[in-house]
Amino acid sequence: DHQVFSLQNYGGVSRYFYELCKELNKINDTETYIPLVLSNNHYISDMSITNHTEFMPNKNFRGKTRLKNTINRLNTQLRFNKFEYNVFHPTYYDPYFLNKIGDKPLVITIYDMIHEKFSEMFPSQEYSAKNKKILAHKASKIIAISESTKQDIIEILGIDENKINVTTEIIVGF
């Protein structure tokens, strides 16, 4: 989905999804698509996985990111009924899509559990941690980027270990 590409021009999560889409598209009968209208993300500027426009790349103003995110979220919600897809893999933890995907498999990637382990240091991330928990329990599969993250997911969120795949080297070009 659009989330991280609305928020990041550069960054680890957007790079992860860029590389993941690039590698998945090399597999026969596999196609990825990110429903974006506006993004200034560097990694997807040369990809055919989205049909977006840069949004005032040289201008910064209050609310710019929120505006991009709102437009992209509305676009994604409108497209749910128009696209054929087999798996939904959101780029971040906003669960806005849960009432739209029906019984389609949901895969999420959890990078770490820092906000949950040290919540007193990240009070502004309480919403993100809450959403991560909701999605982890709804997900068909969870990708963890390390064994340590997997153990934290099991201990902190109470997720069955069989639901979690550790993929430390998912990205070839990273």
Feature map (PLM): residue ranges:
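Carbohydrate transferase catalytic cores enriched for Leloir-type hexosyltransferases
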Residues: 1-174
